[in-house]
Swiss-Prot record:
Membrane topology: Single-pass type II membrane protein
The UniProt record lists the keyword Protein biosynthesis: no
InterPro entries: Glyco_trans_29 (IPR001675), Glycosyltr_29_Sialyltrsf (IPR050943), GT29-like_sf (IPR038578), Sialyl_trans (IPR012163)
Catalytic activity: [N-acetyl-alpha-D-neuraminosyl-(2->8)](n) + CMP-N-acetyl-beta-neuraminate = [N-acetyl-alpha-D-neuraminosyl-(2->8)](n+1) + CMP + H(+)
Protein name: CMP-N-acetylneuraminate-poly-alpha-2,8-sialyltransferase
Gene Ontology biological process terms, A to Z: ganglioside biosynthetic process; N-glycan processing; oligosaccharide metabolic process; protein glycosylation; sialylation
Enzyme Commission (EC) number: 2.4.3.-
Example of a GO cellular component annotation carried by this entry: Golgi membrane
Post-translational modification: Autopolysialylated.
Tissue distribution: Strongly expressed in lung, heart and spleen and weakly in brain.
Entry keywords, A to Z: Disulfide bond, Glycoprotein, Glycosyltransferase, Golgi apparatus, Membrane, Secreted, Signal-anchor, Transferase, Transmembrane, Transmembrane helix
Compartments where found: Golgi apparatus membrane; Secreted
Amino acid sequence: MRSIRKRWTICTISLLLIFYKTKEIARTEEHQETQLIGDGELCLSRSLVNSSDKIIRKAGSTIFQHSVQGWKINSSLVLEIRKNILRFLDAERDVSVVKSSFKPGDVIHYVLDRRRTLNISHNLHSLLPEVSPMKNRRFKTCAVVGNSGILLDSGCGKEIDSHNFVIRCNLAPVVEFAADVGTKSDFITMNPSVVQRAFGGFRNESDREKFVHRLSMLNDSVLWIPAFMVKGGEKHVEWVNALILKNKLQVRTAYPSLRLIHAVRGYWLTNKVPIKRPSTGLLMYTLATRFCDEIHLYGFWPFPKDLNGKAVKYHYYDDLKYRYFSNASPHRMPLEFKTLNVLHNRGALKLTTGKCMKQ
């Protein structure tokens, strides 16, 4: 009899704890959404910041249910966010260094490893743009396309391609996934590690031909290569530069300024979003606020399952695994997503995580 009462007591306490945690999550979400105030600043409470990852980890993706139906752009908020970001960086300028920034033979320190240096090669210098590739460019609608497997079976391809300007990340493949991700690419990032992971480190002619073919599809698009972040990828950058020059590819290369990543991080930290290093997706959204009137995000989903409990791949195009909540990760993607979700609900951007309506 005593053991039965003990089990009932434990069960009752467990139910009360679940009820309390559910109420806590609801209150936290409600509080966060009321914190987007003056000057476009995203002011998150200290308690939310400190508990954010814990809450997200326990509740999973279920706390991020938002609707795209009835979504409306909040133009005044968009303008205030742009104005606030301009206090930290000017994307038109910081999106790339230009030829006049360096001369061949100059030695610079890596952005995230100041003890190590890089020599500006002749090939690299020859590919630096004369002026910013985003100078005086403005667009009504932009799509920033992440690489989450949430895009698979979304049917978002046509909607993505309908935007005036499409930004993609890490040279992700598009042709074989066109129905879900589209093919239009106006600005595409490429971490040096992509050379090894997706193109075999250019070990043979077939790998090099595959890479050249991929870049030839970009035509006059901007290829954004973060060449100055950390030591280790410099040989890949040089190989890429050499192939572009040898094959006379028409892609427009860009290499982010030495201050960009710290300026972007500074903006979010000042607005009480304690990121480590901004992910490529968050970085692209931050830059896009400078030249896009309306920003739509696709392929952003830093969780292993969707809202229905179905497994979601880290990348839509490969089987790479990622531990979203690992302290060893340089990013805090769930926290970034939580922030973007708040901005969606306030009309600053549109975040699509489900199926797209047929056009």
